[in-house]
Amino acid sequence: MEQVNKTVVREFVVLGFSSLARLQQLLFVIFLLLYLFTLGTNAIIISTIVLDRALHTPMYFFLAILSCSEICYTFVIVPKMLVDLLSQKKTISFLGCAIQMFSFLFFGSSHSFLLAAMGYDRYMAICNPLRYSVLMGHGVCMGLMAAACACGFTVSLVTTSLVFHLPFHSSNQLHHFFCDISPVLKLASQHSGFSQLVIFMLGVFALVIPLLLILVSYIRIISAILKIPSSVGRYKTFSTCASHLIVVTVHYSCASFIYLRPKTNYTSSQDTLISVSYTILTPLFNPMIYSLRNKEFKSALRRTIGQTFYPLS
């Protein structure tokens, strides 16, 4: 009889930034501007790569895919968050929460494997420069992209299914601004040891394995660079990897802090702050890190702007 009388959770109350009630409108304006800027910068990068044939190379192919990923990644979270900031009723349905978690994990996990593919691309460019165009043909690039998406789909499907098969009979107050794994698991009626298992699975398949692949690529890259006799040549060669290394460092630092650390040492407000950094800020800065440091891309952008606005000049 006790089980029958329990109320099944059909929606979650998204508390998010409720502790900052007086700043809701200010946060809305800030996050809206950041979101629009993210969409704009990534759209510019994608269109420049598509329109300029000089950028039709494996490295820029992956950069365009990365920008597409960032747009989708933020679209899953930010619009709903903006609506909640201005709404009195800050809720999300049970199904909507599951869809949001699946989508977020899919794009986030695919992003990790995409970074591994980009590391492999840098390895092939530096260690096999003469055969690079053959070894990294269109078919190989498409295959790496498909593999990244397949891995992301598997991780997100398994993890989301396991989480939402748990019984939810207790509180429905979600202490976060979107349906991330840990905040949702805290609301499950039974999850003894299960939360650690799910997070471990996510960490291994979506973080540890891609990171190991990246490390293997860079061990070989560094080994090849050290064989270059000129210090100028070594610096110039390694500089082609600098942007990728910065993005990898930021991505894995934030993700590891959220998913691979002991949960008892940090509050939900600290989790929210870190989550803002990797769901809103990194999608804005990642493509910019790649493009602004790249002279070839900046030249292509100037050509594209010139051909678009001054076609007859």
Curated annotation (Swiss-Prot):
Which InterPro entries does the entry mention? GPCR_Rhodpsn (IPR000276), GPCR_Rhodpsn_7TM (IPR017452), Olfact_rcpt (IPR000725)
Name the membrane topology term.
Answer: Multi-pass membrane protein
Which GO biological-process labels does this protein carry?
A: detection of chemical stimulus involved in sensory perception of smell
The UniProt entry, under PROSITE patterns, shows: G_PROTEIN_RECEP_F1_2
**Which residues lie toward the Cytoplasmic compartment?**
47-54, 121-139, 218-237, 293-313
Membrane topology (Extracellular) = 1-25, 76-99, 161-197, 259-271
Where does it localize? Answer: Cell membrane
Tell me which CDD domains the record gives: 7tmA_OR10A-like
The residues that the database entry marks as glycosylated are: 5, 265
Name the major location: membrane
Q: What does this protein do?
A: Odorant receptor.
Q: Which family does it belong to?
A: Belongs to the G-protein coupled receptor 1 family.
Q: What name does UniProt use for this protein? A: Olfactory receptor 10K1
Please give the organism: Homo sapiens
